[in-house]
């Protein structure tokens, strides 16, 4: 048998891990080939299984690190992936910073390393400009596809009274996790970029409930009992902070974090997480955070995230007249969405009436002249007056009051009345 270890063999990963670990230890022992982050934290060549990433200042330092890494790999009788017949190579260099700085040519096994401005790694696009623009764009495109998958699954599978609960589980497992992977560790994340991700979330709600863009955004979360993506990212970032603080304090990640915490610059991750701690009402004391077990801290963050979500959603609710008749004390799915005596269409209709998105002229007037009821032409066309509309009363036995729809326990008779009213109005159209 040949005296070699194959990459895909049983011992391949162990040999690979040992090799990259040896590189790091040699850098520490020699006190060289380490990038000084903010002139304080030493950043060794980063390694993940068989991937290597060296960080160095342009010039002599980058040339020296390049020679060191290639030499160490060749001494192990290993090779980096150089350009193939199509000119594609897994070995690239990326220049960060001013372009007028001298950036030397780097070689791998005698082959010039191509320069790139971006590189995809583990689902994230690393950009020379340090921005998340393309990452967000990719996540949005991915999210739109996931929304279509979820809606298709819901429409072609019978979930009975569990339809909306299943929909929210699919949202969390497929959509939220699909478009927010690793986002908690991104730096320089802009509010506008978070909003782009949340727009995909809103798209799913609109398709799920068959409502227009003018539907109050907060109604989706308050009625269906879920937390906005922006708040989810805040919670995940704070949980990652707990993970960092639990690491060995002499380690590279912890050293990098402390350096950034003590000397922050605009867009740094530590600035984002400090704002998250403030928003969620969690003390920024390292001692306090470390004192909590992983599970206890996770539960604390979950509770605080719900409180914060409720607070910001209620602020939005107070700015919308359409939501004035609804009251919320916590983030939870409203009872009518889980009832077994209501059809999916009846639940969607209830949502529209509760949020004043039902098809009445006054619900969509937006500053225009008053709209008159198309049936009797004797009153303003709004959903409240539909219960006393002469034309409707001649065709439907009205039981209950329109205000019943804003209660926690909505009578079945009231739901049936608004369904019949909607059917009559649709026939008139």
Model-derived regions: residue spans:
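Family-specific functional microsites
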Residues: 152, 157-160, 315-429
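Short, conserved micro-motifs composed of acidic
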Residues: 82-117, 138
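Mobile genetic element proteins and their domesticated derivatives, centered on retroelements
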Residues: 8, 20, 50-52, 80, ...
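Basic, alpha-helical interaction scaffolds
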Residues: 49, 110-187, 243, 251
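Extended C-terminal regions of large enzymes
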Residues: 177, 200-201, 212-357, 361
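Conserved pre-motif C helix in the palm subdomain of viral-like polymerases
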Residues: 2-33, 175
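Conserved, non-catalytic sequence blocks in retroelement Pol enzymes and Pol-derived host proteins
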Residues: 4-16, 37-38, 57-60, 130-138, ...
């Amino acid at each position: 048998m040949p005296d070699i270890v194959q990459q895909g063999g049983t011992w391949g990963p162990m040999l690979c891990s040992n090799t990259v670990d040896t590189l790091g230890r040699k850098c520490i022992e020699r006190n060289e080939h380490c990038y000084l982050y903010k002139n304080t934290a030493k950043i060794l060549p980063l390694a993940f299984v068989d991937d290597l990433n060296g960080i160095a200042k342009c010039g002599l330092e980058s040339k020296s690190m390049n020679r060191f890494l290639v030499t160490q790999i060749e001494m192990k009788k290993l090779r980096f992936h150089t350009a193939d017949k199509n000119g594609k190579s897994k070995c690239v260099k990326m220049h960060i910073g001013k372009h007028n700085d001298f950036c030397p040519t780097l070689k791998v096994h005698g082959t010039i390393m191509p320069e790139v401005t971006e590189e995809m790694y583990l689902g994230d696009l690393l950009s020379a400009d340090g921005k998340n623009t393309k990452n967000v764009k990719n996540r949005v495109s991915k999210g739109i596809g996931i929304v279509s998958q979820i809606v298709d699954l819901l429409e072609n599978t019978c979930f009975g009274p569990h339809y909306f609960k299943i929909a929210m589980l699919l949202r969390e497992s497929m959509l939220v996790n699909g478009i927010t992977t690793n986002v908690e560790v991104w730096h320089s994340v802009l509010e506008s970029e978070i909003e782009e991700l949340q727009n995909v979330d809103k798209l799913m709600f609109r398709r799920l409930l068959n409502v227009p863009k003018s539907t109050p955004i907060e109604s989706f979360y308050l009625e269906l009992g879920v937390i906005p993506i922006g708040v989810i990212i805040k919670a995940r970032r704070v949980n990652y902070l707990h993970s960092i603080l639990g690491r060995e304090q002499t380690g590279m990640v912890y050293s990098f974090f402390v350096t950034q915490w003590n000397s922050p610059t605009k867009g740094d991750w530590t600035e984002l997480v400090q704002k998250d701690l403030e928003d969620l009402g969690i003390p920024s004391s390292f001692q306090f955070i470390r004192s909590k077990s992983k599970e206890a801290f996770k539960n604390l963050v979950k509770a605080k995230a719900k409180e914060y979500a409720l607070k910001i959603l209620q602020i939005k609710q107070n700015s919308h007249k359409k939501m004035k008749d609804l009251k919320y004390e916590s983030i939870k799915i409203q009872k009518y969405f889980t009832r077994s005596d209501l059809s999916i269409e009846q639940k969607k209709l209830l949502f529209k009436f509760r949020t004043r998105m039902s098809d009445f002229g006054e619900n969509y007037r937006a500053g225009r002249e008053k709209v008159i009821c198309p049936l009797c032409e004797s009153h303003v066309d709004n959903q409240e007056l539909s219960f006393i509309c002469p034309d409707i009363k001649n065709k439907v036995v009205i039981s209950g009051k329109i205000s019943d729809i804003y209660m926690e326990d909505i009578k079945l008779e009231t739901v049936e009345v608004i369904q019949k009213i909607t059917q009559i109005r649709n026939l008139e159209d």
